[in-house]
Structures are given as C-alpha cells and as structure tokens.
C-alpha cells in the first residue's frame, strides 16, 4: 500500500510518514561517518574518506569537510553534489550578512537559514529532499563554541558531540561513554581518532582514510582560526594515538 505514496514528496502515508525524506535519510546511512566534538578551547571535526578504487587519484583537498566562513566549518555525509549546493547557499547568506552588518553571522541563525531551505524541499511538489546531513562547527560572541547537526527534513539541534553517516550509532554510543565537558582540543582530537579507529573496517588508520579540521581562537590576533588539516598534521595525531595504544 505504501508504494502509492512513494513518488510524491508532499503526501503523507496513512501512518504519517514522508517516504521521500526517509529515503534521503537512508542514503546518508550508506555514506562515510563524520563526527564533531566540542572542547573547552575549540571544536574538532573528523570524517571518513572512502577510497573506492586504487586507481582513483588522491587529492590533498578535503571531500567531507568545508569552510563556510571565517567562524564556521562543516562536515557532510550523503550526496556530495547536494552538499555543494547547500554549502554555496550558506556561504552566500553568510557573506550577505557580513556585508550588511560588518560582523560574522551568528552560527545558529545561519544553520536555521539553511534548514529552512532544506525543509522547503520536503513541502513543495516537483522537488526532492537533499540527501545529505551536516555537522556545523562554529563560534560567535553570543554562545561561544557550538556544534549543530541537521538532516534532510530540515530539523537541527545543538550538541556537545555527535556523528552522522554510516556507523554513526556506534560512534554515538562511544561518545556517551567517554565524552567529558572539560576536555581540551588535543584530548578531543585523540578521542576522534579513537572513535574512528573502532568503527571503521580498517586495521590501521592513515591520512588517506580520514580528514580532520579544527576551529580555535587565536587570542593574540583576536580572530578565529578554521583549519582543515594537511596530511602531515593528520599523521602526527595518528602517530600519537598509536604510541598511546602501544603503551597501554
């Protein structure tokens, strides 16, 4: 019976479900995992980089982590093409706010604007939901460091630590057991490596398999630093984690 409700985005099933939104969520469950952890001095984003073929040329640029503005980064899980559209939209909205008010847009206000667009694609005929979830990491003078998660329905929430994509349930279970409010950025980075190593189907992590990004505040210049890590920086944190594992 439910098949007659599948093709139309805007029609609820008798059980009150929107199947197209559920299918979009299912696409995210087949994507690589991405996670975010808030520390007292910054935020860590980490993501699995899936290598589909040995013949594929490896790029230095990240494919799951993106800059949105000077005070905000994001991680994505799902359809990358859909993510690119929403990221470009978020960048335009942020730049328009910056030009108008001469300051960076508050994080939650920007997340809400993007989620309003995503929600519209679940409500109008002839459209389909965006098949991508986001983790937004940012800072503003109102609430400090913030981590938001959003899904194709347009819902969003604020978190201290969360994950999206495949194996996200396992990562969230580990987060509930091990996350603490007073960790610093180095501890959060080590925790992110630990969570990825326990959930990915791999004997050893390398910079080719994961991506890292951090957002911190440079107190000397009084500005935010949103940084997507290079290969040697990722290897450094991986080596530290492996050394800790050997000693334990």
Curated annotation (Swiss-Prot):
GO terms for cellular component: cytosol; nucleus; proteasome core complex, alpha-subunit complex. It comes from the Eukaryota. It holds the Pfam family Proteasome_A_N. The keyword Transmembrane does not apply. Its main location: cytoplasm. Keywords: Cytoplasm, Nucleus, Proteasome. It is found in: Cytoplasm; Nucleus. The keyword Chaperone does not apply. GO terms for biological process: proteasome-mediated ubiquitin-dependent protein catabolic process. Gene3D superfamilies: Glutamine Phosphoribosylpyrophosphate, subunit 1, domain 1. The proteasome is a multicatalytic proteinase complex which is characterized by its ability to cleave peptides with Arg, Phe, Tyr, Leu, and Glu adjacent to the leaving group at neutral or slightly basic pH. The proteasome has an ATP-dependent proteolytic activity. NCBIfam families: PRK03996.1. The 26S proteasome consists of a 20S proteasome core and two 19S regulatory subunits. The 20S proteasome core is composed of 28 subunits that are arranged in four stacked rings, resulting in a barrel-shaped structure. The two end rings are each formed by seven alpha subunits, and the two central rings are each formed by seven beta subunits. The catalytic chamber with the active sites is on the inside of the barrel. Belongs to the peptidase T1A family. PANTHER family: PROTEASOME SUBUNIT ALPHA/BETA. This is Probable proteasome subunit alpha type-3. It comes from Schizosaccharomyces pombe (strain 972 / ATCC 24843) (Fission yeast). The lineage of its organism: Eukaryota, Fungi, Dikarya, Ascomycota, Taphrinomycotina.
């Amino acid at each position: 019976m439910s098949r007659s409700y599948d093709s139309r985005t805007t029609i609820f099933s008798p059980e009150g479900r929107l199947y197209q939104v559920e299918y979009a969520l299912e696409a995210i469950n087949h994507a690589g995992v991405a996670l975010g952890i808030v520390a007292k001095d910054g935020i860590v984003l980490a993501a699995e980089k899936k290598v589909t073929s040995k013949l594929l040329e490896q790029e230095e640029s990240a494919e799951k982590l993106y800059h949105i503005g000077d005070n905000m980064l994001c991680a994505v899980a799902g359809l990358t093409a859909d993510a690119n559209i929403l990221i470009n939209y978020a960048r335009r909205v942020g730049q328009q706010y910056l030009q108008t008010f001469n300051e960076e847009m508050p994080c939650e206000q920007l997340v809400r604007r993007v989620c309003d667009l995503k929600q519209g694609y679940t409500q109008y005929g002839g459209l389909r939901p965006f098949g991508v979830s986001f983790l937004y990491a940012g800072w503003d003078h109102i609430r400090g460091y913030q981590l938001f998660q959003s899904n194709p329905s347009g819902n969003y929430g604020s978190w201290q630590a969360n994950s999206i994509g495949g194996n996200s349930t396992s990562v969230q279970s580990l987060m509930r057991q091990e996350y603490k409010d007073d960790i610093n950025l180095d501890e959060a980075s080590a925790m992110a490596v630990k969570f990825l190593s326990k959930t990915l189907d791999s004997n050893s992590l390398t910079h080719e398999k994961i991506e890292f990004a951090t957002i911190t505040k440079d107190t000397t210049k009084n500005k935010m630093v949103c940084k997507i890590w290079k290969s040697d920086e990722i290897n450094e944190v991986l080596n530290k984690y492996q050394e800790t594992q050997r000693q334990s």
